[in-house]
Curated annotation (Swiss-Prot):
The lineage of its organism: Bacteria, Pseudomonadati, Pseudomonadota, Alphaproteobacteria, Hyphomicrobiales. FAD binds at residues 11-16. Keywords: Cytoplasm, FAD, Flavoprotein, NAD, tRNA processing. One of its GO terms (cellular component) is cytosol. This is tRNA uridine 5-carboxymethylaminomethyl modification enzyme MnmG. HAMAP family: MnmG_GidA. Its main location: cytoplasm.
Length: 624
């Protein structure tokens, strides 16, 4: 073998960039293997980062010193906080990105990262020795030795593009697929499935009639993703909004038999929550129109991404569709939309560190695990990279659970339940939404990142200063109080019960905000506005957070009951069905067992009682 590394990451997309830099931050000698450095960090589909649920993941990546938030801030050309009118728990930061700036910023991060080298080439085979991963071989026969491999191949594993009746092998447009790795996975014993995703046509913005569409500005001022970004300096743009028309739907209905999805050419599952335009028309036939967001792809690029009309219909049909849409009747299509099928591994083959159970030292992240989306991929990449570095160095693994963050929710969903279609993150997937907010990701995760060694010194100093300021602000707000009569002088109506209420308690009232309490106590005006926002949210949710804390403690009790090496045939009282499901899934804890289909509360009680009995036996044996 020509060289040796602690960790090798295959693939330079969103998962691969986070995995490689996370491993490198942990001190592992890391190599990132990618076809070309010039395509590292490319946004293959939509030119946007974040959104509902997804924005939470970006903030969590940032809290652990990952790249996506900082890079998105550097390249963002329109920032919007989605669900702003709803509670903070379900708000989702989102940014429209300049594709070229995003890739350039990501490539700069990769080039400047310590402990990281980039190897241009195609990984073709996994090398196994003594029952664990030992290295990789490239298609040009170069081989590299390693202690851990992270595979982040996106849509490249036996990728097949579909456009109308035509199809051809590709990882994405104009790029070859990865064929050898699929063979390698099958040789090792993995069963590969097929999934599908799609992308819309790209349009020439210079030929769009912008006067015929609604224009949508971003937030002013824009709110960054990263706590390390003081302000956004990139020029901001507006997006357009238009709709499909009944005439659009007629064109689609007349040609739907030519869509690979409906002709039988594609049999794999696509993302339920990001359907193709032909899917929308067939499934929602009563709708007279579907919204389309016209998203510019860059400040010096006229290309526009029409979000909402992903399609794989033939090129001439796509042109006919566009001609029926307001603002697009004379548009020039730069590139047609298409669908792509690719191989994936059943994520139930993984443990919560994203290491495969079948082959120690092999980690998987991103679309190979059945997810869809840049943010889902990046979060998995970070977790896989951290754990690959720990595995290569002989350290203890790090597991993020469902109470830690959305990245823990996603990974637990994947490794426990598996997937039948591409997995996308939503806030509704999290049980502890009030705790797992986008605004407090650093409060939840950065201390953990500092302890494990993946957070740099600059961020650690910034975080400690912020937490000290928040603590001091809460102490001040808790120390200041008024009676109901005193509050009435400031126009605040409270229950006349004679009880004094602190500024923090007043903030819990829906109609009382920071401005009202600062009017009573001018000293509160000296508190940093960002800290004040956090304090007000904490106050509004305080009583509910206390209840949720009890729920989290109960969850963690179940998670602490470890099922390692349990012989389920030796557990009396379990049904044959429960035994079979537990043996097949091999859950890590009683809590994880409870999230398996078909495992009843009675079965969980039997498992908990069995573990307690076994623990008592071990204690008795040790003391004898």
């Amino acid at each position: 073998m020509t060289a040796s590394f602690d960790v090798i990451v295959i693939g330079g997309g969103h998962a691969g960039c986070e995995a490689a830099t996370a491993a490198a931050r942990m001190g592992a000698r890391t190599a990132l293997v990618t076809h070309r450095l010039s395509t590292v960090g490319a946004m293959s589909c939509n030119p946007a980062i974040g959104g509902l649920g997804k924005g939470h993941l970006v903030r969590e990546i940032d809290a652990l010193d990952g790249l996506m938030g900082r890079v998105a801030d550097a390249a963002g050309i329109q920032f919007r906080m989605l669900n702003r009118r709803k509670g903070p728990a379900v708000r989702g930061p989102r940014a429209q990105e300049d594709r070229k700036l995003y890739a350039a910023a990501m490539q700069a991060e990769i080039r400047e990262a310590a402990n990281l080298v980039v190897i241009e080439g195609e990984a073709d085979d996994l090398i196994v020795a003594d029952g664990r991963i030992a290295g990789i071989r490239l298609i040009d026969s170069r081989a590299f030795k390693t202690g851990a491999v992270v595979v982040t191949t996106g849509t490249f594993l036996r990728g097949l593009i579909h456009l109308g009746e035509k199809s051809w092998p590709a990882g994405r447009v104009d790029e070859a697929p990865a064929l050898g790795l699929s063979v390698s996975f099958e040789r090792i014993g993995f069963t590969l499935g097929r999934l599908k995703t799609g992308t819309p046509p790209r349009l020439d913005g210079a030929t769009i009639d912008w006067a015929a569409v609604e224009m949508q500005p971003g937030d002013d001022p824009p709110e960054p993703f990263s706590v390390m970004t003081s302000r956004i300096t990139t020029p901001q743009i507006r997006c357009g909004i238009t709709r499909t028309m009944p005439a659009t739907h007629e064109v689609i209905r007349a040609n739907v038999h030519r869509s690979p999805i409906y002709s039988g050419q594609i049999r794999s599952s696509g993302p339920r929550y990001c359907p193709s335009l032909e899917d929308k028309v067939v499934r929602f036939g009563d709708r007279d129109g579907h919204q389309i967001f016209l998203e510019p792809e860059g400040l010096d690029d006229t290309t526009v991404y029409p979000n909402g009309i992903s399609t794989s219909l033939p090129e001439e049909v796509q042109l006919a569709i566009l001609a029926t849409i307001p603002g697009l009747t004379k548009v020039r299509m730069i590139r047609p939309g298409y669908a792509i099928e690719y191989d994936h591994v059943d994520p139930r083959e993984l443990d919560p560190t994203l290491q495969t159970r079948r082959l120690p030292g092999l980690f998987l992240a991103g679309q190979i695990n059945g997810t869809t989306g840049y943010e889902e991929a990046a979060a998995q990449g970070l977790v896989a990279g951290l754990n690959a570095a720990l595995a290569a160095g002989g350290g203890d693994p790090v597991v993020f659970d469902r109470a830690d963050g959305y990245l823990g929710v996603m990974i637990d969903d994947l490794v426990t339940r598996g997937i039948t279609e591409p997995y996308r993150m939503f806030t509704s997937r999290a049980e502890y939404r009030l705790t797992l907010r986008a605004d407090n990701a650093d409060q939840r995760l950065t201390d953990k990142g500092i302890a494990m060694g993946c957070v740099g010194a600059g961020r650690a100093v910034h975080h400690r200063a912020k937490m000290a300021a928040l603590s001091a602000a809460k102490a001040l707000a808790t120390s200041l109080s008024v009676t109901p009569n005193e509050a009435a002088r400031y126009g605040l109506s409270l229950n006349r019960d004679g009880h004094r209420r602190s500024a923090f308690e007043l903030l819990a009232y829906p109609e009382i905000g920071w401005g009202e309490v600062a009017a009573i106590w001018p000293e509160l005006s000296a508190i940093d506005p960002g800290v004040a926002v956090h304090l007000e949210i904490d106050a509004k949710y305080d009583v509910y957070l206390k209840r949720q804390t009890a729920d989290v403690e109960a969850f963690r009790r179940d998670e602490s009951l470890v099922l390692a090496d349990v012989d389920y045939d030796a557990v009396p009282g379990l049904s044959n069905e429960a035994r079979a499901r537990l043996e097949r899934a091999r859950p890590r804890t009683v809590g994880q067992a409870g999230r398996l289909d078909g495992i009843t509360p009675a079965a969980l009680g039997i498992l908990a009682a069995y573990l307690r009995r076994e623990a008592r036996k071990k204690t008795a044996t040790a003391s004898a």
